[in-house]
Amino acid sequence: MNIYIGWLFKLIPLIMGLICIALGGFVLESSGQSEYFVAGHVLISLAAICLALFTTAFIIISQLTRGVNTYYNTLFPIIGYAGSIITMIWGWALLAGNDVMADEFVAGHVIFGVGMIAACVSTVAASSGHFLLIPKNAAGSKSDGTPVQAYSSLIGNCLIAVPVLLTLLGFIWSITLLRSADITPHYVAGHVLLGLTAICACLIGLVATIVHQTRNTFSTKEHWLWCYWVIFLGSITVLQGIYVLVSSDASARLAPGIILICLGMICYSIFSKVWLLALVWRRTCSLANRIPMIPVFTCLFCLFLASFLAEMAQTDMGYFIPSRVLVGLGAVCFTLFSIVSILEAGSAKK
């Protein structure tokens, strides 16, 4: 990879994170209304995902340009995990007060869910510490065994366990909230948290794929399994969003319904990464360099939809939160474009 292109792909996650923080701060300063509070806090929290994606980009690009660096393999996942933990603590702090307002309740749950995603993405960074073994293993055969440089089976299983446990936590928590969906804050927070949990579940597939390909244990059975898993979760999340939008006439349905559809777009962006790694594993794919276009399209979907919603929010404040949050989700999708491009450069056979 060209060193200048490498730096560009490293900078994209940081720039997108700064945009999320800047827009979130601007929204918070604009008004004290509850819609501004929720949208501003959620936008700022999305920077944690961008930070975690930056650590992933840095680790892989550094290997492509300079080789494996054990210092980077330790430092950058720690940075990502630190950002995710701070984000989860921030979300929990909003929920820990004695008299939690509705806007704090919703924002706290969403921010905590964003922190869970950031932790899962940081696990992608941690599992990518020996990314160069993937094209090497793909050029060989399963009979070659596990390379001595690869993570042990125990460490690999621990890495996969992180998104699995966070997915279970998010699922149980969101279902608990939805059991009291007649309370509006529970209804909104429960649906959005369930969508965020779907992203964590998608990242199980990505972490498992990277770990197993690094260890040369990527089986024929799971070759396409994770692709189906991620596309299924993305589609279910989009359908959930559509269901929320059409299931009632209440204004409270607008934010969770629209945001769920765009969380499905993030799932599809993750699908592009899982699909790419499956496509180039012990085979040649001439279209591999087109796969990074998937997160570009999902990014454009989020941004164009946000622009329409911003106009609609002039007359209906129910559209205000999604019109702002979708800009941040578009930024996350564009950050995923840089990661998919890096994976394509490092693993695809030209």
Regions found by a protein language model. Give the residues of each.
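Short, charged juxtamembrane terminal tails flanking transmembrane helices
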Residues: 1-3, 141-144, 343-350
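Cytosolic-side membrane-entry/anchor segment at the start of a transmembrane helix
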Residues: 1-5, 67, 216-221
